[in-house]
Amino acid sequence: MAGRRQGGAQHFTVQEAQNATLGQVGSMYNDGTAAMVAPTDHVFVAITFITDTTFDSSGGLIAVDSDRFVNTEAAATPLAGSSGGVQLDSSNTFPAGLTIYGRWTEIDPASGSGLIAYIGK
């Protein structure tokens, strides 16, 4: 294929690389409260909630960068001079039908737990 670098499954064309950042690497479904961990060298780039869902207060939603992406470990305030972001805890409910975007390495639902997590690079 023209434009493809040789050397293995992890080498992508520009278009394939862009698709990978949008969750086209794959997805995982969770209908319980077990933790989901992203595959090696990958992250979860979006989460769609099938049912109303909460996360464990500690370790429930682990961001690649807790300053940039909403998470349960710290209040995300990504830009200099920004404020007002709060740390997620088990009192925050994400309603069915909502999709959130970010870069997370682990998703650990506390309740509800009908969700689809989309995998990207």
What are these regions (language model features)?
Residues 47-49, 117:
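Generic structural hydrophobic/aromatic packing signal, biased to beta-strands
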Residues 17-19, 32-41, 52-53, 58-59, ...:
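Glycine-centered loop/turn motifs
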Residues 1-41, 111-121:
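C-terminal interaction-tip segments
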Residues 54-76, 113-121:
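Short, surface-exposed beta-strand/strand-loop-strand elements in extracellular ectodomains
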Residues 51, 104, 111:
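Residues on the solvent-exposed faces and adjacent turns
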Residues 25, 30-36, 81-106, 115-120:
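Beta-sandwich interaction modules
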Residues 46, 63, 69-76, 88-97:
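Extracellular beta-sheet-rich ligand-binding/adhesion modules
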Residues 45-47, 107:
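Hydrophobic beta-strand segments within beta-rich accessory/binding domains
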